[in-house]
Amino acid sequence: LRYNGCALPRRANTFVDVLSAGGYRTASIGKSHLQPFTEKEPLGNKDTKERLISEAWKSDENPYIAEQPSTYEDGKGVEFESPYYGFQHVDMVTGHGYACGGHYGQWFRKKYPNWKELHDRKNELPNNYSCPQSFRTPIPEEAYPTAWIGDRAVDYINDSAKQDAPFFAFVSFPDPHHPFNPPGKYWDMYSPDEFSVDLPYSAHKNPTPAMQDVNRMWEAGESGAIPQMAFRASDEHVKETMALTAGMITMIDDQVGRLIQSLKDNGQYDNTVIVFTSDHGDYLGDFNMLLKGPLKLGSITRVPMIWSDPNSRTAVRTKTLGSTIDLSASILERAGFEPYNGMQGKSFLRSLSGDEPHRDEVLIEFNNNDARMGMVTVPRVRTLRSKSWRLSVYADEDWGELYDLENDPNETHNLWNDEKAEKAKLKLSLRLVEHLARQTDSSPRSKRLA
């Protein structure tokens, strides 16, 4: 999955396939996004040239429609090719916010015959917020996607207690995400006055061209071509967004609490590993920006990671670096299974005590299918993050990023063109190349000498 709009080929193995082959019952409950969940054409990615053959790879003839909206229209039944990337059971949620689709959307339309009215922004509940993409939804808390996912996950846990086989459940909440629309009491659970903009745009000593473009659009009153594009916001709007995001997070916390209580009620808590993490962050006010984009600020790449293990529920915090791709190898090791050839992550189990480092550096890759934030080409970004530095290289751009995290943890002074940082830049660039070389696929393994 190089970027949004691609589907993970069905011929790809996943660590969930390994768990399933090892006797685990497997479930995906909530957002999957292993296939496209809109039917819109991408921006700026149209090939206007006449070609005899259009792509380097032949199509595998799979339509990849398991997550697109039309698949779930009119309440029709959806039969997944089972298993779905290793998941034997699927409760699908697509999209974000109050108007999610998939199995949830089918349930919502059946449960609430007035669903169109509940989704109509003209019926927004009264409120004093004006930040972009905020919406006080009239949907009841118990019918919001976060609660529905919690309900389905509790049902799955209860059913698993009756089975002999162990289970793996991927419970994925679309929130926190724009649109910013926590339901019910979660809307005004937090006040914007509880938050502050600690990194205003003026805090950056030499804003990158991408940041300058976001600022230019804000000053000109322009908006992005699509709602997903990062934008600059006023301090007031940033604080409103923070408050609404906190409401969405608290609602998820409450659902996680329900899952843990269900495990305890069923006598499974002392035999279940619980992993809590996220796919990425949000600028959420850093330099007055909201949403996300090619700039790999810490607010985007630093995510929560909790590994709660029945072998030791003692809280230990480690400062070692890790990567999302390490989750698969770690889960397989904990389950007692060997990873397949070609898995790029490495297990971090031995670092959980806090004494043994896991990684000294992390490679972060970002591709997009349309140009954003004033970039001249479609973003292809490669970042190396160590405890002391962050280096980001932007293909086909005449600028990059280099931050001394020991002396500038908030990334306010870009040293890319600083002669005093040339030695560090060269060393990090070499290390980045080594990481990229290491990423070369080793699967499939050769079956002949030559």
Predicted regions and their residues:
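Formylglycine-dependent sulfatase
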Residues: 1-394, 399-400, 410-430, 444
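Short, charged, surface-exposed hinge/linker loops at domain edges
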Residues: 441-450
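Mixed-charge, Lys/Arg-enriched low-complexity segments
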Residues: 435-441
